[in-house]
Amino acid sequence: MLRRRVVALSVFVLFGAASFANAQAPEGGGARAGAPAPGGAAQGARAGGGPARRPALFFREEWKQNEKSDEHPITQESVANANLELKLYGPNAKEMDITGKAGDENNPIHVWAGLCTGPCAVLLRDKASYADLSGLARIRWNTKMSGYHQIRPIVKLADGTMYVGDRADGSTRDWIVSEINFADLKWLKMDPAKSVTTGNIVDKIDLSKVDEVGFVDLMPGSGHGAGGWVDVAQIELYANKVAR
């Protein structure tokens, strides 16, 4: 009787061990324990395999003062980068000014939109290349605001269509450097003549061939003194180049 009990107990233990081993084994020959879940490591990877790569600097603009270093209307002469063309949009865009001093981090050379009596946009166009803003392309800028004003990224595609991103940047406390990744944005079309948004929000647009890139302030300025305006100093765009 005792022998039968020992045999039965041994069979029970062996059966339990086999069941535990089967439970731990991956189904269908899958990855071993501790391996990343399917697709987990591939998030953000390029179509050809491997991690997505951050694009190099496409352009940098620091703006250029005149000989007097005073406040004056922005023109093509205000662009320090010889490879870039200045593009202004909005009925009052020519009311934007350049001010500030070179080498002064408390008052760097910058675009000031305080005199814009309506929405105003500033875009930059590379003479030789379109910008591919897909993937990990991003824009970095040094800005300061007054009141509730903020700037938003704006793009003009190769077909002439213009879009404004749904993210806004700006701090009223001090100059702040911030970045926006284009892949994170949703978009609204912009009427270039009025610098106002139109239509419904678009989740994704084709950013593989962008003609111009810049910023827009969708609120009118309040003039000199505290109230409502935007300051935009250095701008850096990180994107791949596409020949024109």
Segments and roles (model prediction):
Residues 24-244:
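Beta-rich carbohydrate-recognition modules and glycan-binding surfaces
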Residues 8-18:
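Bacterial N-terminal signal peptides
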Residues 19-23:
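Juxtamembrane cytosolic interface motif at the C-terminal end of transmembrane helices
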Residues 1-9:
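Bacterial N-terminal signal peptides that target proteins for export
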